[in-house]
Amino acid sequence: MSFFHAGKIRVMLIGGEGREHAIVWSLSKSPKVDLIICAPGNGGTARGSTKIKNCDPDIKATDLTGLLGVAETHRVDLVVPCSDSSIISGAVDFFETRGFRVFGPSKKVAKIEGSKRWAKAFMERHKIPTASYQSFSSPSEASLFLQSQPTSRHVVKASGLAAGKGVFLCNTKEEAEDAVNKFMVERVFGEAGEEIVIEEFLVGRELSVTIITDGKVWRLFPVGQDAQRIYDGNLGPNTGGMGVCIPSDFFNVEEILEIQQTILEPTIRGLEDESKVTPYSFLSITALTNSRS
């Protein structure tokens, strides 16, 4: 089901966070866009243009049936799931099978974001460089592993979605044990922490590489650096992202080409091979250059 309105299109964005506001702001400037529906949107998305309309503030990004009703009511031409939870729940597949044009990854491909354990195993299968790791579903086994390691510094991650907050950079074994306890005993992130990944602690320059792809052809956006820590000066715990500097001048062409050949291309090929469908419309990868343990 798709409608066109005098050569202009109507877009529905699923989600209500900062990224939705940024996308809405950009779409509202296009003469090709007639109406933007934010489901549910937020205070920022509701301001700045007569093209933008928030829908029911109580609707959830995972309520696909309810969102379908919104899309049909407003006769939208394009659906853009922005919320991680909506993507993981299969919003792209859901709307595509009902005749809508959708920008985003299928549910199969979204596993690379929804499960860090699966993502790490995927990288191993396709020989994509990644930090060494172990995954655990038992806090006692995770603790025994930490105590057996010769190094003190580790990265402890919730395997599931935790709104960008499920990564702890631990400088001591005590900090790592505390992270395990938060995830698996206190369950501060609920089901997201039922399984965890413990990685080696790598140090280097971090960059964010973003592409648009249909699974065969891809285009690279300018490379940036994501500010993930909550406080100024790169301090405090990780968040879903406080901002990003684009373009970044800290990386050279040779480094970008290496990332393209060793990470981007194998990832796209691997996702296509394993999903057996057009795997992605959008892919963002964080890489570490000149890394060391």
Q: What name fits each language-model region?
A:
Residues 1-107:
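ATP-binding N-terminal substructure of ATP-dependent carboxylate-amine bond-forming enzymes
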Residues 7-9, 32-34, 75-76, 98-99, ...:
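Short coil/turn connectors at secondary-structure junctions
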Residues 17, 21, 61-65, 73, ...:
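Electropositive phosphate-/nucleotide-binding environments in soluble metabolic enzymes
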Residues 61-137, 141-148, 155, 161-162:
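Conserved N-proximal alpha/beta basic substrate-recognition cap immediately N-terminal to
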Residues 14-15, 81-82, 156-159, 199, ...:
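Short beta-strand segments
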Residues 153-173:
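Conserved anion/nucleotide-ligand pocket segment
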Residues 170-293:
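Internal nucleotide-binding/catalytic subdomain
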